[in-house]
Swiss-Prot record:
Disulfide bonds: none annotated. It catalyses: ATP + H2O + 4 H(+)(in) = ADP + phosphate + 5 H(+)(out). This is ATP synthase subunit beta. The keyword Translocase applies. The lineage of its organism: Bacteria, Pseudomonadati, Pseudomonadota, Gammaproteobacteria, Lysobacterales. ATP binds at G148, G149, A150, G151, V152, G153, K154, T155. It comes from Xanthomonas oryzae pv. oryzae (strain KACC10331 / KXO85). HAMAP family: ATP_synth_beta_bact. Its main location: membrane.
Length: 468
C-alpha cells in the first residue's frame, strides 16, 4: 500500500503528496496515521498531489503526517448486522453497543442498476394520511419527496409515514439522517425502540454539526445498506422490499456546495456547485426497484425561503414519482398536515392505476378547491353575500374539504393530546365523495377539523349541537 504525506490543509480539504507512480485513484480512501480520520480523494492535481475531503474533523492534523492509500473506496458494513444499530458515514457504530457484526462490506460508490434489471410497479402504498392517499398516492417502489420551508412539518410528516408504513410493513427500513438535528435522530431511535421495530431498521447519521464530507457521503452510506437488502437474494431468488427514508436531501446538496467551494470550483446559479444535477443524479438513479426487490424512498426536501424554483428543490423534482408540497399558508390556518392539495402531484394519478372512483373524487376535490381559490379575492373585497348561491355552496364545501384534510397524527399525540388516526383509502374516498355530493352540507365546517373518518365528523357535529 502506497503512502503519501499531507502538504496542505484548508478546512475540510486536505492535499496529500504521493510518489508519482503510486498516485491513488479518485474516490479511493486514505487513512491518516495516528488518527481516526479517513480522507476521500476528489481530484488529482498533478505532480503526485491529490486533493481530498476529510470525513471527520481535521482538528489536530498537521503537515507531513503520513496517509496510507487503502486502494479501494470507502466500504461500509451491510446485511443483518446493521439492523437496530446507529452508524456514522464510515459504518462505525455510534450507539455504544459494540462493533457491527457484518458478514460483508460494500463500497459506497456503485453504479445504478441497468435498464433491463429495473422494474416499475403500479401497486399503491396506503399511508393512512387522507390528503396524501387521495391527492398524491404513493407507488410501492416509487420515490416520494416532502417539500416544505422551515417549520411547516416535513419531519413530523416523515415520522408519521414511518409510523404508518414501516410498522405495518413487514420488510426492512433504512433511515439516513443527512445534516439534520441530532435531537431528531435521537427521537427517531426512541420512537422505533418503543414500537418494537428497531430490529428491522438500520440508522445512519451525519448530523448538522459534522464536517461537509460526512454530510455529503452519509446518504450514499445509507443507500448502500438499502441496496444490499434489495439485491441480496434469498432461497427463492428474491431480494427484499426496503423502505429508505432520507432527511434531508437539501443538506446533501448544501454539503456538496461547501465541498465544491473548498475544492476551488467556480459556483453556478445562486452559489450552488456546477455539478449539482450530476450529484443529485448519482444518488437518485441508484434509488430504484429491480426485478428482485424494491426500494421505496421517502425524502424530505427543505425549500430555502419557500422558493420552489430554487435550483436545489427544482433539481430534485425531476427524479420523483410523487411530490408532497407543504404550504406555510395552510399551516398558518392551523390545518395539519399542511399539504397543499393543488400543488402536490403523483404519477399514479391515472384512472387505470388508482381506479375511476378514486380519480373522479380527487378531480372533484381539486376543482372545488381551485374554484374557492379563485373566489377568495372577491370574498376579501365584497364579502360572501355578493356571491351567487352556487358559488356560496362551492365555498362552503371547499372549506369543509380543507378542514377534513386535517388529521391527528400518532407521532404528535404527545403535543396535541388527541389520539392519532389512521384512515383507510376506502374511507377517505367515501368521505370526500360524500362532501362533494353535498350529503353533509348541513353540518358546520368546524365538525370536519382534526377528525379521522367522516363518521367522526358527524359525531363531532352532533356533540357540538348538543352543547349549543
Amino acid at each position: 500500500m502506497s503512502q503519501g504525506k499531507i502538504v496542505q490543509i484548508i478546512g475540510a480539504v486536505v492535499d496529500v503528496e504521493f510518489p508519482r507512480n503510486e498516485v491513488p485513484k479518485v474516490y479511493h480512501a486514505l487513512k491518516v496515521e495516528g488518527t481516526e480520520i479517513t480522507l476521500e480523494v476528489q481530484q488529482q492535481l498533478g505532480d503526485g498531489v491529490v486533493r481530498t475531503i476529510a470525513l471527520g474533523s481535521t482538528d489536530g492534523l498537521k503537515r507531513n503526517l503520513l496517509a496510507t492509500n487503502t486502494e479501494r473506496a470507502i466500504s461500509v458494513p451491510v446485511g443483518a448486522g446493521t439492523l437496530g444499530r446507529i452508524m456514522d458515514v464510515l459504518g462505525r457504530p455510534i450507539d455504544e453497543a459494540g462493533d457491527v457484526q457484518a458478514s460483508d462490506h460494500w463500497e459506497i460508490h456503485r453504479g445504478a442498476p441497468s435498464y433491463e434489471d429495473q422494474s416499475s410497479s403500479t401497486e399503491l402504498l396506503e399511508t393512512g394520511i387522507k390528503v396524501i392517499d387521495l391527492m398524491c398516492p404513493f407507488a410501492k417502489g416509487g420515490k416520494v419527496g416532502l417539500f416544505g420551508g422551515a417549520g411547516v412539518g416535513k419531519t413530523v410528516n416523515m415520522m408519521e409515514l414511518i409510523n404508518n408504513i414501516a410498522k405495518a410493513h413487514s420488510g426492512l427500513s433504512v433511515f439516513a439522517g443527512v445534516g439534520e438535528r441530532t435531537r431528531e435522530g435521537n427521537d427517531f431511535y426512541h420512537e422505533m425502540k418503543d414500537s418494537n421495530v428497531l430490529d428491522k431498521v438500520a440508522m445512519v447519521y451525519g448530523q448538522m454539526n459534522e464536517p461537509p464530507g460526512n454530510r455529503l457521503r452519509v446518504a450514499l452510506t445509507g443507500l448502500t445498506m438499502a441496496e444490499y437488502f434489495r439485491d441480496e437474494k434469498d432461497a427463492n431468488g428474491k431480494g427484499k422490499d426496503v423502505l429508505l427514508f432520507v432527511d434531508n436531501i437539501y443538506r446533501y446538496t448544501l454539503a456538496g456546495t461547501e465541498v465544491s467551494a473548498l475544492l476551488g470550483r467556480m459556483p453556478s446559479a445562486v452559489g450552488y456547485q456546477p455539478t449539482l444535477a450530476e450529484e443529485m443524479g448519482v444518488l437518485q438513479e441508484r434509488i430504484t426497484s429491480t426485478k428482485s426487490g424494491s426500494i421505496t424512498s421517502i425524502q424530505a426536501v427543505y425549500v430555502p425561503a419557500d422558493d420552489l424554483t430554487d435550483p436545489s428543490p427544482a433539481t430534485t423534482f425531476a427524479h420523483l414519482d410523487s411530490t408532497v408540497t407543504l404550504s406555510r399558508n395552510i399551516a398558518s390556518l392551523g390545518i395539519y398536515p399542511a399539504v397543499d392539495p393543488l400543488d402536490s402531484t403523483s404519477r399514479q394519478m391515472d384512472p387505470l392505476v388508482i381506479g375511476h372512483e378514486h380519480y373522479d373524487t380527487a378531480q372533484r376535490v381539486q376543482q372545488t378547491l381551485q374554484k374557492y381559490k379563485e373566489l377568495k379575492d372577491i370574498i376579501a373585497i365584497l364579502g360572501m353575500d355578493e356571491l351567487s348561491e352556487e358559488d356560496k355552496q362551492s365555498v362552503s364545501r371547499a372549506r369543509k374539504i380543507e378542514r377534513f384534510f386535517s388529521q391527528p397524527f400518532h407521532v404528535a399525540e404527545v403535543f396535541t393530546g388527541s389520539p392519532g388516526k389512521y384512515v383507510s383509502l376506502k374511507d377517505t374516498i367515501r368521505g370526500f365523495k360524500a362532501i362533494c355530493d353535498g350529503e353533509y352540507d348541513h353540518l358546520p365546517e368546524q365538525a370536519f377539523y382534526m377528525v379521522g373518518s367522516i363518521e367522526e365528523a358527524v359525531e363531532k357535529a352532533n356533540k357540538m349541537s348538543a352543547k349549543a
